[in-house]
Amino acid sequence: MGKEVDNKFTWVIKNFSSQQSRKNYSDEFFVDGCKWRLLAFPKGNGVEKLSLYLAVAGSEFLPDGWRRHAYFHFSVVNQLSDELSQARETKNWFDASTSDWGFTSMLSLKKLHDKDGGFLVNGELKIVVDVSVLEVIGKLDVPVESEETTTKALSELEENDVPEESEETTKALSKVDENDGAESNDSLKEASSVKESMDVNGFRVLPSQVETVSCIFERHPDIASEFGPKNQHLRSAYMNVLLSLIKTMCQSTQELSKDDLSDADAALAYLTDAGLNLNWLEEKLEEVSEKKENEEAGETRVHEIEEELKELKLKCSNLEAQLEKEKADVSVARAPFSFDDIV
């Protein structure tokens, strides 16, 4: 079931918890003359998280050399509080080799299936996608009135205040089971080129990332001394994975799950295998993992103490009731007989 309004498409998946298929496709919808559909993995695409992708519908029927550049924003709607909705965004070039793109780790299944979490109401999951087509190479799926919808420049996107690609949304190079950033659902893909970028120690990064990356090289100048890849696209993609990993580790232990830490450990191994010197980050990740263990152990102790306190309060309440009864009995026993009682 789906509903299209302007550039937004709403997909309501009924009886989500009872879905048996590995993956589900939404109805097809049109945005700027291009035909799309959503792809979801209800039980996760190799991870314990909802996996969600935007796909070009009918890509097998498009002519050779077709390409589409699109920005899109996903939102898994929390039906109890919109502020708790899970949102992710990215942009990517779609072509014959990359007909879908999105997020393997959109939302943890534990949080999704929480009966009081607000994501599943009456068995329904609601997903909203907002798509903006930036450029089209090859024919459109439907005729449009204006040539402007055939080719949209990136500058037009910026004029409409569409968000720039962020660190978290460009983690495109990681393996599917090691990454929670934007990626194709079925293979390792090269990150889309970024038109506006700056060089920091041989890495092309976004202007918003310059300060952070510069700080990393200042504190760890040998971080890339043995780094293998020379291609700028690959180097940028690895840097985005590193920045996203650091951002993940900066979250509170309450926000981090064991799955998150497992993914972080896998991502770290992936980066070190490429030649990045990250011994310092490995130590910090161990500290974060230890803090998570301490938090969980502390939560367990708190729960145990709360239960013990509850039992003690109940026992105290019972003792107080028994005390009042005993006092009443003593009061009765102390009362003297009257003349009438005796005579």
UniProtKB/Swiss-Prot annotation:
Signal peptide: none annotated. InterPro entries: MATH-CC_domain_protein, MATH/TRAF_dom, PLipase-like, TRAF-like. Residues 6-131 form the MATH domain. Pfam families: MATH_2, PEARLI-4. Residues 168-178 have a biased composition (Basic and acidic residues). Keywords: Coiled coil. Residues 156-167 have a biased composition (Acidic residues). The keyword Coiled coil applies. Residues 156-193 are annotated as: Disordered. Residues 271-335 form a coiled coil. Transmembrane segments: none annotated. This is MATH domain and coiled-coil domain-containing protein At3g58270.
